[in-house]
C-alpha cells in the first residue's frame, strides 16, 4: 500500500508527477475520493482527465469514492464517470449517508466498469446476502422522489460553514473556506507546535473538541478537522468560548 500526500499547494489533489514509475507499474488499483474528507479538496475537470490517462497508461483500476457529491457549495461538481474513458478504467461509489442523512442505514451504490462491478458483486455475495429489504426500498424512494431535500441539506451545511469560518476569522483564526463536504480543514495557529497540543489546549480551555490532523496521516500534521454537524446556537457558543479563551490573540 502506497499513500499519496494531499497538499494545500496542489489544492489537495493527487500530484501524478510525484508517483515514481515503479510504484505506478506495481499498482493494481488507486483509491481516489473527491470531494475529499478530511481536506475538503474538490477535483476539477483537468484532474479527472489526468487520472484517466494515468490509469490507462499503467493499467490501474480506479475506485472513486464520491460520497460528498451533493455537498458542494460553489456550483455543481462532477462524477468521475462523466469523463471519456472513465468506464474503461474504474468505478465510482456513492452513499446515501451524506446526501439523504441515512448514515445509520449503511447503504450506497457503485457503478462503472462492467467487469469490476461483476467482481464486486461476487465479493459481496460471499460477504453478505444483501441489504435489509425495507432499507433498500427506503433508498429507492430517496433517490427517485422529489430532491428538494438535497438542496435543503446543502444549504444548511453551507450556512454552518459560513458561520464557523467567518466566526473563526473574526476572533483571529484565519482559516480557509471549504468548497465542499461537511467539514472544515483548518491550519492550526502558528504559536502551537503540533496538532495534538492545540487540540488538547483548545479542549481544556473551551470544551470545544476538534480532530487533530495527524489522525488522518502524517501529512495532516499542523491541521485540525471540524465537522459542520452542530446547530447554529452550538457553533456560536463554541466561537464565544474560543474568543474568550485568548488562544487566538
Describe every region a protein language model picked out.
Residues 1-249:
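PLP-dependent class I/II
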Amino acid at each position: 500500500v502506497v499513500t499519496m500526500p494531499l497538499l494545500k499547494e496542489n489544492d489537495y489533489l493527487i500530484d501524478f508527477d510525484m508517483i515514481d514509475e515503479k510504484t505506478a507499474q506495481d499498482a493494481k488499483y488507486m483509491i481516489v475520493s473527491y470531494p475529499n474528507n478530511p481536506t475538503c479538496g474538490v477535483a476539477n475537470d483537468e484532474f479527472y482527465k489526468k487520472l484517466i490517462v494515468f490509469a490507462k497508461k499503467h493499467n490501474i483500476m480506479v475506485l472513486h469514492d464520491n460520497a460528498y457529491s451533493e455537498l458542494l457549495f460553489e456550483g455543481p461538481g462532477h462524477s468521475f464517470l462523466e469523463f471519456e474513458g472513465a468506464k474503461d478504467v474504474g468505478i465510482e461509489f456513492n452513499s446515501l449517508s451524506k446526501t439523504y442523512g441515512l448514515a445509520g442505514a449503511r447503504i450506497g451504490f457503485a457503478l462503472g466498469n462492467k467487469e469490476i462491478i461483476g467482481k464486486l458483486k461476487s465479493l459481496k455475495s460471499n460477504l453478505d446476502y444483501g441489504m435489509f429489504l425495507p432499507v433498500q426500498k427506503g433508498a429507492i424512494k430517496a433517490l427517485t422522489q422529489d430532491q428538494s431535500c438535497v438542496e435543503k441539506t446543502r444549504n444548511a451545511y453551507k450556512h454552518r460553514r459560513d458561520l464557523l469560518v467567518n466566526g473563526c476569522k473574526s476572533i483571529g483564526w484565519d482559516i480557509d473556506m471549504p468548497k465542499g463536504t461537511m467539514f472544515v480543514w483548518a491550519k492550526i495557529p502558528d504559536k502551537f507546535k503540533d496538532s495534538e497540543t492545540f487540540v488538547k489546549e483548545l479542549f481544556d480551555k473551551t470544551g470545544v473538541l476538534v480532530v487533530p490532523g495527524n489522525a488522518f496521516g502524517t501529512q495532516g500534521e499542523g491541521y485540525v478537522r471540524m465537522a459542520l454537524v452542530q446547530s447554529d446556537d452550538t457553533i456560536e457558543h463554541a466561537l464565544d468560548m474560543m474568543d474568550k479563551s485568548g488562544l487566538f490573540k
